[in-house]
Curated annotation (Swiss-Prot):
Entry's family note: Belongs to the NifH/BchL/ChlL family.
Modifications after synthesis and translation: The reversible ADP-ribosylation of Arg-100 inactivates the nitrogenase reductase and regulates nitrogenase activity.
UniProt gene name: nifH1
Name of the protein in question: Nitrogenase iron protein 1
Biological process according to GO: nitrogen fixation
Amino acid sequence: MTRKIAFYGKGGIGKSTTQQNTAAAMAYYHGKKIFIHGCDPKADCTRLVLGGVAQTTIMDTLRELGEDAVTAENVINTGFDGIKCVESGGPEPGVGCAGRGVITAINLMEEMGAYSEDLDFIHFDVLGDVVCGGFAMPIREGKAQEVYIVASGEMMATYAANNICKGLLKYAEQSGVRLGGIICNSRRVDNELEMMEEFASALGTQLLYFVPRDNIVQKAEFNKKTVVEYDPTCNQALEYKELAKKILENDMFVIPKPLSMDQLEKMVERYGLMD
């Protein structure tokens, strides 16, 4: 049975980098068949898996060529180790609703049978915070069953993660979606591991994995590759291998208990991350 996963996190946290490296690790080390559906109007959720190729998005195809042109051949590309990739895209800057584009794109993929039964995982890589109904769609309508939140020990990253949990709490009963855990993409801030463990525990979930910071991630990106493709024997690639294994074996799925703003600020203050 295909597992449908949504990756959420604050913009700039490294969510798409983490998601793509995890997908690459699942395929390369664990032999899994992966489909990545990018749900970010920047359309950068699949770039590393595709070797830097700028993918034609579903919304661009709809705008320029019409719905009949949205075919698997036109919008789905295959990247590293057979990973299939599609990008929702978004409206022209300043016009329309990007969240609406996510809804349209997912519906079109379902109608054309793109989420085939032979897939082991579908990754929905979703823009930052749950800022509107469109970006909440993967969790609101049960498109994804599991959510992993990419965060760090910085205040705004934990604030965004907490907001995402509020969205999860709102939709969990109707859609069946559950939180699988927090993935810390380390920024090397003081007491980061300890704070993220406490934050995850307060939410009623687990710190699924702590991804250390390593410059090879940037080197791989300069070469338009995931770390797993760039150097599959390096330490960081093996970290992603272990993260993928944690997701594969995860059996802790919860409805989160979001913190109040006061609770969140007090926790951050305790760890000395605020002036």
